[in-house]
Amino acid sequence: MPGNTKKSADSGLTAKDYYFDSYSHWGIHEEMLKDDVRTLSYRDAIMQNPHLFRDKIVLDVGCGTGILSMFCARAGAKHVYGVDMSEIIHKAVQIVEVNKLSDRITLIQGKMEEIQLPVEKVDIIVSEWMGYFLLYESMLDTVLVARDRYLAPDGLLFPDRAQIQLAAIEDADYKSEKIGFWDDVYGFDFSPIKKDVWKEPLVDTVDRIAVNTNSCVILDLDLKTVKKEDLAFSSPFEITATRNDFVHAFLAWFDIEFSACHKPIKFSTGPFSRYTHWKQTVFYTHKDLTVKAGEYIRGTITCKPAEGNHRELDIDISYTFNPREPNREPVSEDLSYRMC
Amino acid sequence: MPGNTKKSADSGLTAKDYYFDSYSHWGIHEEMLKDDVRTLSYRDAIMQNPHLFRDKIVLDVGCGTGILSMFCARAGAKHVYGVDMSEIIHKAVQIVEVNKLSDRITLIQGKMEEIQLPVEKVDIIVSEWMGYFLLYESMLDTVLVARDRYLAPDGLLFPDRAQIQLAAIEDADYKSEKIGFWDDVYGFDFSPIKKDVWKEPLVDTVDRIAVNTNSCVILDLDLKTVKKEDLAFSSPFEITATRNDFVHAFLAWFDIEFSACHKPIKFSTGPFSRYTHWKQTVFYTHKDLTVKAGEYIRGTITCKPAEGNHRELDIDISYTFNPREPNREPVSEDLSYRMC
């Protein structure tokens, strides 16, 4: 995996912040727009289906720069309401203006939970709400609030389905670069940091050849029916080694579907698909496993908002591995991670 | 230049933050420690000069994980005081402990301006205070406070010299990727964002072959004598084209020197030196220049903390270019940038 180390602000005597945003206010929008797996999937789902959008009332939850709202207007929507709490919406207003769509798109700054749309119901809700590991700092809660309050009984959601997949990977080199590094830092023992680094899932790109098991769906969301409480979940999993190899980590990614389209449109953020800015999420195990093709790793993954901070995710993975031959020890671990 | 787009948090309906730190609290420390141009320069400046550190009292301003304090202890310092306002200092305490240096290193959480050291004076101040473009969110103000309050008259500063250099670059492809992109975003005009993007210096790596002028020192700081007010500066510059080429941007970087060392140690964050996490800083011009080898670009660069937010930097660049032949138009611009 590329060693594009991640950054944080917890450094320095004064606020010597290395937030990327501290030197690029537009970078995230540039990155999301240039993520064409993401943006073209939305564009095609919307603009290839004018028969679904023509003369419809659309709500764009978390409209950002307004790109999805403009796709909907181009697809023939009667009117689009874009809602975003961020200051970006002031730019979105200017963008909609220069693109001469102000008469068909109304942008509202505020929290979905607090604002009042000028309409009772909408026919379609579009939203790009997904976060890392699908649920980390995602806007799904907000989309569900919008759905329950505004979506007409026969209304449509774009997208309307999301799945999280789990597999395992061989990752010796990068694991030692990310975890082992702290054992000897220029001759000093940094193990007090190592144990915290271990608890933190790593968001990064993984080469498909690192995956050495099949994958298992650990969450399958139908956005039309899912409830907020379903987003805290516990799922058993069983994955099977596809070759003789070592396992150093579990790997998670998500897939998205727009099933309301004439021809269903899907995209994956997994290692077998093109790069997206969501990358994948790596959970390093403490023990390394020596697996043979056909052997199982069985376990349970639990994910819930952290106590006291609902923007953080607590993810626990308990697994057991029983090798076929007695010359390899059975392995089982109960691992706890936090995305924060 | 690699298109590693920068990220910000100004996105989404709920706090869908893409701060890198939102998924790596240790990444910045990992990145800084793994920046071996940085870390090995400090290590060598300190540990190759035990004759300067033996039995001395040292203050480490912004000690972070404590690595510099530990270098000083290893170099024979009698006692090291490490000060940092961030929570990281709790980890530093544990790290110093496991490395059995607690008797020689005292770590204090707080603002340099507010805390009281248990000593009247220190013999040496070490600090890694540099930010992007040297001064952006840097800790230099704080180092100067520490110097004026605690450094003995004949005391030493590590480092004790910093320079900012300015040159020009050819950067057509990346300029169109970063600036031109906003002209046509999936068929929409995003020019309202383009004009803001232009005002923001880009922190990124630049290939040495892109540099097509000589460089000019625009700031030269002697840390023993510099005053806080000197950090708001205005400097004339004159740079000379080294080949027939096009100029798309000005480029700034900084160089650091530890001149107190037996053998002075220097490192550069410029395009002609190895990668550092500070990269370089790019200021895109609005007009592109057609220059011939030997022709001058003359101007003035002004840098000061932004009104109302001293963590932001206002940087103005005014320049004039007079080509030798009349068939090329003279060009002059007054450009304003903000690092925020």
UniProtKB/Swiss-Prot annotation, chains A, B:
It catalyses: L-arginyl-[protein] + S-adenosyl-L-methionine = N(omega)-methyl-L-arginyl-[protein] + S-adenosyl-L-homocysteine + H(+); L-arginyl-[protein] + 2 S-adenosyl-L-methionine = N(omega),N(omega)-dimethyl-L-arginyl-[protein] + 2 S-adenosyl-L-homocysteine + 2 H(+). Keywords: Methyltransferase, Nucleus, Phosphoprotein, S-adenosyl-L-methionine, Transferase. The active site is at residues 128, 137. Its EC number is 2.1.1.319. S-adenosyl-L-methionine binds at residues 29, 38, 62, 84, 113. Coiled coil: none annotated. The keyword Magnesium does not apply. GO terms for cellular component: cytosol; nucleus. The modification Phosphotyrosine is found at residue 19. GO terms for biological process: chromatin remodeling; methylation; regulation of DNA-templated transcription. The modification Phosphoserine is found at residue 176. It holds the Pfam family Methyltransf_25. It is an enzyme of class 2 (transferase). InterPro entries: Arg_MeTrfase (IPR025799), Methyltransf_25 (IPR041698), PRMT_dom (IPR055135), SAM-dependent_MTases_sf (IPR029063). Residues 16-311 form the SAM-dependent MTase PRMT-type domain. One of its GO terms (molecular function) is histone methyltransferase activity. It is found in: Nucleus. Interacts with pab2. S-adenosyl-L-methionine-dependent protein-arginine N-methyltransferase that catalyzes both the mono- and asymmetric (type I) dimethylation of the guanidino nitrogens of arginine residues in target proteins. Asymmetrically dimethylates the polyadenylate-binding protein pab2, modulating pab2 oligomerization. Belongs to the class I-like SAM-binding methyltransferase superfamily. Protein arginine N-methyltransferase family. PANTHER family: PROTEIN ARGININE N-METHYLTRANSFERASE (PTHR11006), PROTEIN ARGININE N-METHYLTRANSFERASE 3 (PTHR11006:SF53). This is Protein arginine N-methyltransferase 1. It comes from Schizosaccharomyces pombe (strain 972 / ATCC 24843). The lineage of its organism: Eukaryota, Fungi, Dikarya, Ascomycota, Taphrinomycotina. The gene is rmt1.
